[in-house]
Regions:
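ABC ATPase NBD coupling module
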Residues: 61-78, 96, 104, 119
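A short, flexible loop at the N-terminus of ABC-type nucleotide-binding domains that lies
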Residues: 1-11, 42-48, 65-68, 91, ...
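Conserved ABC ATPase "signature" region
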Residues: 60, 114-140
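A short, proline-enriched helix->beta-strand linker immediately N-terminal to the Walker B motif
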Residues: 164-168
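Conserved ABC ATPase signature
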Residues: 144-149, 153
Length: 185
């Protein structure tokens, strides 16, 4: 009902140590995605965290302003979203989208050419990430737009973007949902 409060998640608490992998398991609609999105304050405008706190590395991050949150996202905490087509910009190449992650958070220049490879440091890093996540012929895929990739390849691009800045905490919201048959060996 409109105007009525609905509690999506209640009394959630978990602690994740460095290097630890934690899986949040529950039935559909149980609040797994809401819990993940709330950590980075990515909930829709109508949602709110009514009580409690969110701590990362011993500090409360639930009250951070936009600039501090932007710095935290990508640098320290990254997220792999469930549906890459809603997260990737349909008008930009995958190289541009991964490069932006690096430019914003690591201040790597895209201007200087490496005399040995003939590539910029950003392009070298983007290619490295694409190869690591299993994108075949990564160099040929740099200029591809998201709709030109398979669902599995788009998911891999999302994973590459999340890993780009070596985050301390990686949140994955059903990251294998769209992966293709090539990883099911």
């Amino acid at each position: 009902n409109q105007g009525q409060e609905t509690r999506a998640v209640s009394n959630v608490s978990y602690a994740i140590a460095p290097g630890e992998t934690v899986g949040l398991v529950g039935e559909s609609g149980s609040g797994k995605s809401v819990s993940a999105l709330s950590i980075l304050k990515l909930l829709p405008p109508s949602a709110r965290i009514s009580q409690g706190s969110i701590s990362f590395e011993g500090r409360d991050i639930s009250g951070l302003d936009s600039a501090a949150l932007q710095n935290l996202r990508g640098n320290d905490i990254a997220m792999i979203f469930q549906e890459p087509m809603t997260s990737l910009n349909p008008l930009h190449s995958i190289e541009k989208q991964i490069s932006e992650c690096l430019e914003i958070h690591q201040e790597i220049s895209g201007d200087d050419l490496d005399p040995k490879t003939g590539r910029t440091p950003i392009r070298t890093r983007v290619l490295d990430l694409l190869y690591k996540v299993g994108i075949p012929d990564a160099e040929k895929r740099l200029s591809a737009l998201p709709h030109e990739l398979s669902g599995g390849q788009r998911q891999r691009v999302m994973i590459a973007m999340a890993l780009a800045n070596n985050p301390k905490l990686l949140i994955a919201d059903e990251p294998t949902t769209a992966l293709d048959v090539t990883v099911q060996k």
